[in-house]
């Protein structure tokens, strides 16, 4: 359980997920984007009564019809099932949804602020003001959005200024969901971090997470500022790990080593671990680029610069731009009037998220070199059309490869792991494969008559 002190208590993990305890909380989730919708649907699946709020009336209408604003495996079924059973509903009425709630989660966007890289917290503070106006009993207000250290203090200040008589506690509860595996991550977490020193808030959070608590999921209760820093530090560390193995991959190419074997050799060390040691075109997505930049700015603001993280962010941006030069070299040094087929657009598989995807600077670089780009992605092409110009989109991998001079694998979707090389070769003008995810081995590509370029294979 949470314990009297409420600090640093971690429970051992158990993988069997128990049925709900029967304690149903009234939860309001402000923000029906990726974090809010996944979290709200999972809380409803625990047996809680959940209302997801969003100012976007069209999004709410579509959710009520069972239409998802994002692609996440299993989410549509989870939302539909819990809505059908009356545990999950959607509204644009923030005030009405907050009144009577036991816990209100703020899960709105915190994009990088234009010009300086700080997190834009205007949506968080606006939500806090509206929640304060609606408070009509003791309420726990939880920041689920990824926010810089000290944001919880400011949320509380904003709320107290709006409602000096309001009875509420502000808690930090950062999310650690991976796109493409978010539902499993929520229900089988590595840890749950709760940032509060308020005894009543601890009791409410224990009831909110009771199914996981009964399942002995690791729960850590700490101070609010510490919880906020844990989230940023975790993402920065993972970004560092990715960037490290990418730089080792560059060295491996120069010295005649194999980065995949290097990664396995160091990953078998329990002190290091194998996760996030997969060399590729650089990290992207909605979290790592934004959060590392926000952490860098926070550290600079407090005269405690994080030089390692600064370097990681800079190296990652350089790497994404450098992938175009790798394709250029594979094509013989000239891409003018050549066709490049790009398989995979999203920043990772099992999502439709194009935010900061490595494919964006890659395709832009290829176009700058004079190439025509044809692309295919199982889920990301609708979003890609919003951020990429002058790209032709294909119906499948083989239509994408038709007439191509070079084929580039940018995202390791499962369907790209078993491509028919004979069909690809027959479709292409020249059989050149640039594998930015090391899906295939050079030997396999060579066996099928392809000139192969991978990552970190000297």
Task: Outline where the language-model segments fall.
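Residue-identity detector for glycine
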Residues: 3-8, 22
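Structural/interface elements that position substrates and couple domains in central-metabolism enzymes
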Residues: 22-458
